[in-house]
Design a protein with these regions (language model features):
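Membrane topogenic/interface segments and analogous intrinsically disordered interaction regions
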Residues: 1-243
Length: 243
């Protein structure tokens, strides 16, 4: 009986260590958001100015101040998660590694490496390469010319930034959902695709994507949410099972 109590206490302490990692990560996201809040206006201003559009023929406008505030807070949260994610995945790796076999350690490390390192890199590519390229491309395609004069164009800054926010949330939520589902299968919590945990994870993913997408994606929210869930579930089924 004493042995059982010791084992139970050991498991409790082990679980408490995992909860501590999650708690510190959440605190890190809050602190990073507070820090970035002092610079978010400058970051957005410099990013908009970095778009290689003809300065004489375009104007950025904000048609809804409240949407602009929501946009800034969404960006703060996305950037904060990207900053803290490497720390979180590193701590989780150190937490779980002692209880895994060598083959399991390799897969586990690669999965966390993808989530903790690749996501921030992809977010950088989206915001500083892909999105500016698309904005500049569609600006050139859609520019209206009248005689020798080019008609001045106005761009809604919130709508442009919201495009990147939507893609960022899809990437972050979809990748983390895939990771959680893969870990559930990896540790035997999901067998033959039958598990309440799997269904709950998919429902949470669907709800998060549906609620986090900006108004720019109205009309596509449900479709995008379903595709994200289906993609995450399909990729997680590739998880190797070591016996």
């Amino acid at each position: 009986m004493e042995f059982y109590q010791n084992e139970k206490m050991t498991f409790s302490e082990h679980f408490s260590e995992l909860f501590k990692i999650i708690r510190l990560s959440a605190l890190g996201v809050v602190m990073a958001s507070i820090f970035l809040s002092f610079y978010i206006d400058d970051i957005l201003g410099n990013w908009l100015e970095s778009l290689s559009l003809d300065a004489d023929n375009f104007v950025f406008s904000v048609y809804s101040p409240y949407d602009w505030i929501d946009t800034k807070w969404a960006l703060l949260l996305i950037f904060s998660i990207a900053m803290i994610l490497p720390y979180t995945t590193y701590k989780i790796r150190n937490f779980a590694l002692p209880g895994l076999y060598d083959k399991e350690k390799k897969w586990f490390t690669l999965s966390l490496l993808f989530s903790g390192v690749i996501i921030p890199i992809l977010l950088y590519l989206i915001w500083f390469i892909a999105l500016p390229f698309l904005v500049n491309y569609f600006d050139e395609v859609g520019m209206v010319e009248g005689g020798n004069n080019i008609v001045s164009a106005r761009y809604d800054a919130v709508s442009i930034i919201s495009l990147g926010i939507g893609v960022s949330w899809i990437l972050v939520i979809g990748t983390l959902t895939t990771l959680v589902l893969s870990m559930s299968r990896f540790f035997g919590m999901v067998t033959d695709n039958e598990s309440r945990i799997r269904i709950r994870i998919l429902l949470i993913c669907f709800s998060l994507v549906l609620l986090s997408l900006p108004s720019t994606y109205d009309g596509l929210r449900i479709i995008i949410s379903l595709l994200t869930v289906l993609f995450a579930d399909s990729i997680s089924r590739l998880t190797p099972i070591f016996e």
